């Protein structure tokens, strides 16, 4: 559900006891962690048990599994996840009691107040860029607070309340949440139509980024990728308005750009040029050109904040990934199994490029779960086209999330658009059968990749178990 943003946004310390409805999610759990670290009393509930809930309990939060009206008792503020329905008993009870209701965006703004905020926005690459910047700053000796949409491997968490003045935050545009923040600096990775279930039109989606630009501190700056047409338009607009803006990219026109890019296996090495000055090399241990662009944005931001190139480069080289971003789940019988959150055509293409680099002479076997009916209706054909970069594709049923089914909008829109011979594409509604298809089609040296923003992430362990059961030495055609 959507909770309106209040006219007056209070700092976290003024919210009293805070109860989170949907505390186990990536967004709310991070905010809860930060509040707990600052001594704020926190409680919360979620539909099912999870490792996240157990971790929050260990930090001092009172966490419930299941939703009941009485669980908001004693709270002063109730933060509500967008995944929660309006008839949720805790939300209904909070409204009846007249408690302060906040959306996630307002709660994040509350913990960011008083800090120098760097907000990372964009259609794709937000989580990775936020993570890279955080690790790079840490290697410069800084201790920034951060809130990220996935667990940072180096920290083992998605959020941290640091001792420094900086707060690095992933700024989600999906429901307009990023228009609540007032950052000192902003990074925009790209701007490409998405979340049209909320925005209605591509023009409205792009206009939201223009409004986001206007929220940047006049003393601050924008970093954006000039290789991306949407982000390049934002750079032009910023300069027209007299705002400080830095372009990054692979193109010759980028102020901070990568040259002499070499990609071998899981590493990418490139030379950084900043307005004609050669600063040195960066080597990333995560594969794919899209990660190079994310690293350039993080690097350019760190440089503009006054940190030395050598330390930033060392931090970027140490970045080992974020959960669900080309995450290696395991290897059995010479077959590696990866998982990734990619669900938009451009994200799918980027991850398959990275997978091709990782696979080398091996083949790529993909299970893709389309995310949301509205996105599949609009982008289904483009998703299918992007999946053509794999060798074997299994398309699962749509993960409908918060939407209702729509007649005629099915995973077939994706499967029918995959430009591979029919014997290499399977439309499979059965979860267990999907795992079987992947194992049946993969052979030693191949790479299995599960893709999607839904519960397809849970498929990896099943695939590994099937591979384990088969044992080594299985001969396949």
Placement of each model-derived feature along the sequence:
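Short internal beta-strands
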Residues: 40-47, 222-226, 365-369, 389-400
